[in-house]
Amino acid sequence: MNQDKYVFSQLTAFLNRTQFNNYVRKYDGDRYVKQFTCWNQLLAMMFGQLSNRESLRDLIVAFEAHRGKQYHLGLGRNPIVKATLSYANQNRNYRIFEDFAFYMMKEACEKRATNILDIPGKKYAFDSTTTFASMTVTVM
């Protein structure tokens, strides 16, 4: 049985939630919200991007398939339904997510390495090229 955190929750741990909440307060994003907050919306849309979902319906099907793991992915305890997600996407201020994206890009630019040799520790290179191997088997 898996004892570690899921990869998605490990990725979202790098997001600065305090800064995101500042943008939510600035644009009053969680006003009149009962359960599906701006943070939940951000994580839901990130999950859709990272899992290569093509539509909202496809994303909701994926959430239903992972309903038991939804809390551990960081998406909360309540199921995410298409109507709620589409309403949030339509009515919430996009500037919350735009400003947060610009903030994250600024942080990434400041922390990037200009020379790979300056990074401490071991360096690994992964090659994902595929090769075609032609084999013939002769039966006698």
What role is predicted for each listed range?
Residues 1-140:
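Conserved, well-structured functional cores that handle cations and Mg-NTP chemistry
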